[in-house]
């Protein structure tokens, strides 16, 4: 279904406010003013602020986008080798997406601050991320806590490194202001030996 012009403006307004002022400034009145819309439209089209943010997340949250992009590729994978390569691809995409996407950085930082009352975005991310995980496990023919925890640690590590190095360039003795550090990070994700004992 095509979005109405007002719906598009409201979604764009959310992005603009987050990018320019931070997630803490999000509110119905501010969004409506930024979008040049009556705030009643937020309730009419999205059932309120939570619904608007959930809709926004579908276009801006990595794992919501990743599920749409990769779920079919998981089901078509023919071997554990394919699964390893696909898992590495998704993790590398996550790294690149988060490094270059200020909106996603602001969202995660706000959630981690403990001040976020907007559960809809996190719930949407968890739902889509876990569906992708379930499809991966189904393809491997097993439900493995080791697989799930392994991927969870990698996802969390990527998030934490990117967010931490926004403020502090050195982490565990590695200078992340140096492009070589990020290349090494990518090479580590592509390290076959790291994955094959868990995913095979």
Regions found by a protein language model. Give the residues of each.
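N-terminal positioning helix adjacent to the helix-turn-helix/winged-helix DNA-binding module
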Residues: 5-13
């Amino acid at each position: 279904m095509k979005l109405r012009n007002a719906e598009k403006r409201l979604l764009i307004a959310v992005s603009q406010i987050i990018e320019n002022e931070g997630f803490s400034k999000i509110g119905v009145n501010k969004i409506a003013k930024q979008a040049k819309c009556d705030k009643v439209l937020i309730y009419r089209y999205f059932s309120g602020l939570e619904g608007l943010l959930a809709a926004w997340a579908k276009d801006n949250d990595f794992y919501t986008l990743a599920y749409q992009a990769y779920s079919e590729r998981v089901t078509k994978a023919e071997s554990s080798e394919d699964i390893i390569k696909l898992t590495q691809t998704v993790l590398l995409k996550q790294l690149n997406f988060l490094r270059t996407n200020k909106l996603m950085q602001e969202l995660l930082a706000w959630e981690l601050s403990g001040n976020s009352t907007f559960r809809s975005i996190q719930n949407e991310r968890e739902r889509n991320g876990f569906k992708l995980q379930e499809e991966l496990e189904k393809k491997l023919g097993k439900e493995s806590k080791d697989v799930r925890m392994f991927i969870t640690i990698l996802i969390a590590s990527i998030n934490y490194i990117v967010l931490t190095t926004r403020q502090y360039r050195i982490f565990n003795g590695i200078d992340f202001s140096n492009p070589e550090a990020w290349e090494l990070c990518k090479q580590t994700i592509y390290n076959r030996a790291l994955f094959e004992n868990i995913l095979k």
